[in-house]
């Protein structure tokens, strides 16, 4: 079991964002904002809630694992044979927030999914930053 876990890979994206954690949290948890930078979904920040991200190519089945408002959010991510966990961590800094996104659970035989996530999450986090900047109704 320990060997299997050691073989799993993780995609990590980190950014310093010039907004408070509350504003970033809003973009991570409000479906109308999630749709702008990630995908449409029926997400709600409630532990054990099952939800689906929907894209033109298919869907991603998810379940909320952890919710610490304005600090951390974690959910499963299941699509096309990939069973992984996405974790968002928000740490306040003097200039805003340090955002860290990790997707853990890529097996060695899932190279295409791993590389796709490496590229895709970077793009999604860039879009997330744009949505945060444009969200005038937030903190």
Where are these regions (language model features)?
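Residues at helix-coil transition
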Residues: 29-30, 39, 69, 126, ...
């Amino acid at each position: 079991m320990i060997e299997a876990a050691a073989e799993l890979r993780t995609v990590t994206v980190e950014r310093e964002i010039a907004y408070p954690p509350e504003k970033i949290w809003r973009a991570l948890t409000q479906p109308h904002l999630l749709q702008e930078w990630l995908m449409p979904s029926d997400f709600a920040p409630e532990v054990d809630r099952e939800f689906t991200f929907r894209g033109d190519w298919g869907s991603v089945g998810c379940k909320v694992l952890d919710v610490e408002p304005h600090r951390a959010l974690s959910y499963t991510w299941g699509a096309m044979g990939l069973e992984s966990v996405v974790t968002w961590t928000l740490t306040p800094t003097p200039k805003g927030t340090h955002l860290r996104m990790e997707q853990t659970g890529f097996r060695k035989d899932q190279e295409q999914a791993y590389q796709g996530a490496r590229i895709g999450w970077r793009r999604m986090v860039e879009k997330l930053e744009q949505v945060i900047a444009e969200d005038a109704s937030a903190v």
